[in-house]
């Protein structure tokens, strides 16, 4: 599947102002405010902009940081990583492979088995719940 190319005007029409600010302008929502920071429902988290599957609720955990956190993406091609030197910091930005939506950042302070923490803005995600099993996936 190739890259999804839309104009900024198209993105602005399709997304809420907050979703646009975060996904297209590399914004960040305040900690502990996003829709999914504390969600424990089972399902698949997809890109808010294009619907690409990004994370499974199985890999979601409570990192205490106030943003949805995952220890791995749903597959190795769903996400791209880029160096981010903004705000006087050195970080690794994560974006959707299909549409380049800004998702958040990945840090090397997560749990095993990966040791990684994919820290993602809720506004970048949409949860597609499992219809068969809508129970909590982590304590």
Curated annotation (Swiss-Prot):
InterPro entries registered for this protein in UniProt: Met_Sox_Rdtase_MsrB (IPR028427), Met_Sox_Rdtase_MsrB_dom (IPR002579), Mss4-like_sf (IPR011057)
GO annotation terms (biological process): protein repair; response to oxidative stress
Cofactor: binding comment: Binds 1 zinc ion per subunit. The zinc ion is important for the structural integrity of the protein.
Catalyzed reaction equations: L-methionyl-[protein] + [thioredoxin]-disulfide + H2O = L-methionyl-(R)-S-oxide-[protein] + [thioredoxin]-dithiol
Domain (MsrB): residue spans on this chain: 8-130
Binding site for Zn(2+): 47, 50, 96, 99
Recorded GO MF terms: peptide-methionine (R)-S-oxide reductase activity; zinc ion binding
Pfam families associated with the record: SelR
GO cellular component, one term: cytoplasm
EC numbers: 1.8.4.12
Active-site residue list: 119 (nucleophile)
Gene3D superfamilies reported for this sequence: Peptide methionine sulfoxide reductase (2.170.150.20)
Names of the cofactor(s): Zn(2+)
Keywords, in A-Z order: Metal-binding, Oxidoreductase, Zinc
Superkingdom of the organism of origin: Bacteria
PANTHER family, per database record: METHIONINE SULFOXIDE REDUCTASE (PTHR10173), METHIONINE-R-SULFOXIDE REDUCTASE B1 (PTHR10173:SF52)
NCBIfam families noted in UniProt: peptide-methionine (R)-S-oxide reductase MsrB
HAMAP family: MsrB (MF_01400)
Membership in a protein family: Belongs to the MsrB Met sulfoxide reductase family.
Protein's name in the database: Peptide methionine sulfoxide reductase MsrB
Name of the gene: msrB
